[in-house]
Amino acid sequence: MPTIQPVLEAAIQLFSQLDSARLEAEVLLSHVLRVKRSYLYTWPNGLLTAHQINQFQALCQRRLQGEPIAYLLGHKEFWSLELQVTPATLIPRPETELLVEQALARLPIQSDAQVVDLGTGSGAIALAIARERPRCRVLATDNAPEALVIAQQNAQRLGLQRIQFRVSDWWQALEQVTAAVVVSNPPYVAITDPHLTQGDVRYEPRNALISGKNGLAAIRLLITQSLVHLEPKGWLLLEHGYNQAAAVQKLLTRQGYAMITTYPDLAGQPRVTVGQKP
């Protein structure tokens, strides 16, 4: 009967063209075996059943076709929270944690403020804020009901009860809502962007990625309709593309926002721009 080490080494060779061949093979095999990665080294001679091998090889083939690891595993870590993800949701990125950081910087520890997360997807941003500011009232919206189902399941599994979820096309279902902080990681990729044919994004929901010819359609709509939904001195925080900061700042300025600032992500790229309602 085959054992762990040769099966793992064969997968690493299969993944030789991937940047993280060993890591990805280990992650997939430990997922199939429902063990931690360290188990693979502690028990290299552990026996594998035919079913386990078939399951592992099927995942490897899907990965070779470019399917994201997060979708193969069914989960992704964000802000130290393990979140369920499916092809109905965007895969949370590390750079989006900057958006959470900047939101928390504007919410005192004991704050019970109203926070709105527009386009929540898997719920990553809303859940991270709710975890760090448990007294805040968090409302998370998305125009995709299937994504909201995943977000709600994540909230329930994590025991985060003070979050409301609502189907809404941006501001559409929020007529009576005003917030101290509004955050959004909206679609901001141009429809002609060549990256759409590369890597993980090929498998992610297009409506969570693409936003018009220059990638600014959703951001423009969010900004131009935002003031009525913010309390006095309230904050709007937006993630955007590395080359969109100037355009986002200009849109905020036109609406009369103050304290407009852009923050870089860990790679040094302009990633989050914020503005305060006068």
Language model feature labels by segment:
Residues 18-19, 133-135, 156-161, 229, ...:
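Short helix-capping segments at alpha-helix termini
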Residues 70, 189-192, 243:
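Active-site beta-alpha loop architecture of Rossmann-like, nucleotide-cofactor-dependent enzymes
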Residues 1-41, 45-48, 58:
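Non-catalytic accessory regions of SAM-dependent methyltransferases
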Residues 213-276:
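Conserved Class I SAM-dependent methyltransferase catalytic core
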Residues 188-218:
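Mobile active-site "lid"/loop adjacent to the S-adenosyl-L-methionine
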Residues 28, 66, 96, 125, ...:
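Residue-level signal for inorganic ion chemistry
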